[in-house]
């Protein structure tokens, strides 16, 4: 901490210029140094090609919206499957859809793309297992589960791909050599 303070004091002293009367305005020198540091940080940020906080938030929001759209498609598919089968199968599909939607919502609200992917994969595994074990007639369950499983697999693959793309773009931006 003392070293940092000494460096800052040295920087202020180097930045300070006496006025016509020979006086040094330390506050003005500190303000100029702060301005220089802020400009250097912005230039470094631009040189590395890093997204601004707003851009990063927009990317994550875009990913979350795409994820929610896919979930809506899967939920619609689940409801269509539920309409094909009456009674207990329809009830189980509705419960399955609610559990899936809740699990995916939890995954989509995770802060990190890797966390989203892990939560989604866990949710898909858990909900798929619940569906398969709760069905009293395995042949009906497997028949109803096949299109749902396909849609879930597609959603998982697209989410994994989107998370990987986002992670790669962030890593390449961070690793981009300064010109």
From Swiss-Prot:
Name of the featured protein: Apolipophorin-3b
Glycan-linked positions: 34, 101
Biased composition (Polar residues): 165-179
Sequence segments annotated as region (Disordered): 152-179
Transmembrane segments: none
Species annotation: Locusta migratoria
Subcellular location field: Secreted
Job of this protein: Assists in the loading of diacylglycerol, generated from triacylglycerol stores in the fat body through the action of adipokinetic hormone, into lipophorin, the hemolymph lipoprotein. It increases the lipid carrying capacity of lipophorin by covering the expanding hydrophobic surface resulting from diacylglycerol uptake. It thus plays a critical role in the transport of lipids during flight in several species of insects.
Coiled-coil features, chain-numbered ranges: none
Miscellaneous comment text of the record: Two isoforms of apolipophorin-3 (a and b) have been found and occur in a ratio of 5a:9b in the hemolymph.
């Amino acid at each position: 901490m003392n070293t940092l303070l000494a460096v800052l004091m040295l920087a202020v002293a180097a930045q300070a210029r006496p006025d016509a009367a020979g006086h040094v305005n330390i506050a003005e020198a500190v303000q100029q140094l702060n301005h220089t540091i802020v400009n250097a940080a912005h230039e470094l940020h631009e040189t590395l090609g890093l997204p601004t906080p707003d851009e990063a938030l927009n990317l994550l929001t875009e990913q979350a919206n795409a994820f929610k759209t896919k979930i809506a498609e899967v939920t619609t598919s689940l409801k269509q499957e539920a309409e094909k089968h009456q009674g207990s199968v329809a009830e189980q599909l509705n419960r399955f859809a609610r559990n899936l939607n809740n699990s995916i919502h939890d995954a989509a609200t995770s802060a990190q793309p890797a966390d989203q992917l892990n939560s989604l994969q866990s949710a898909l595994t858990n909900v798929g297992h619940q569906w398969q074990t709760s069905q009293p007639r395995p042949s009906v369950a497997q028949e109803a589960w096949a299109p749902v499983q396909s849609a879930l697999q597609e959603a998982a693959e697209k989410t994994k791909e989107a998370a990987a793309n986002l992670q790669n773009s962030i890593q390449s931006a961070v690793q981009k050599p300064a010109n």
